[in-house]
Amino acid sequence: MFVRVLVSNVVWLALVAAAPVAPDLAEAFGARESVEQISLSPDGSKIAYIAPRPGQGAALYTVNLADGQPVMAASVDGDPERLTRCDWLSNNRLACRIFAVVASIEIMPVTRWVALDADGKNSKMLSQSEQLNQRYATGYGGNIVDLLPGRDGSILMDRWFVPEAALKTRLADEREGYGVVRIDSRTLAATVVEAPVRFGVEFLSDGQGEIRIMGTQLPSSAAGYSGSKVKYSYRAKGSKRWEPFSEYDVLSDEGMNPYAIDPALNAAYVLQKLNGRIALYRVSLDGSLRKELVFAHPQ
């Protein structure tokens, strides 16, 4: 009898131990993604991914797929810097975007791009440094317009040019507006590719170093607030002259909104409404602006 009871108790304990534990829904709801962003090197031999760290922190890890061992190349604690994305510039160099909210005189969002090797060494600030003689501050650190495949670490980045105050000098840079520069991520040597446009808001490259589309957004009033319409211009292949392309309303989604350029087809891919829904079109950049539907979903 004693043996039978003992065996029954052991079996009952085993069943209790094997019973599934209900998940902590609150913990699962608040959990961060184990991989927040990932990218593959141009030759396919390495990956880079951003993973969370304790608190608000995050780290960039690179992995050589030959051995599969992750290496921490960079990290931030999240107070206030946030690591938002990293892209390969070459087979051994990356550019990472850092976002922060800085509270000084007022609360201001700030972005900066930093280039570094896959092992975290040789870091360089790609975003333009602010100078004391600039007429105003900007938190915009630019964005990558073209990774320039095959250029071994050089890229095209957009930049907001801030004019300098001519304090006891005649060498102040008075350029202002939205332009594009080519930057060597190792030496930081920079060349202006597109001169700043006062009301420029967007540039699209063909992926081979040629800027083919530009967007401008005029203010809606004397107060300087941006209007809702973006006017897009394009360049024919081999030309530097801007031609009208489309007008897009950011509030109503009316008009053609260009997203990418196919250099082989000499065409732009745009989103535009079709029967009240967004559809994908291909528009020729040969001067005809011939448009053909690529994809539309009935629902």
Indicate where each model-derived feature is located.
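N-terminal secretory signal peptides that target proteins for export/translocation
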Residues: M1-V3
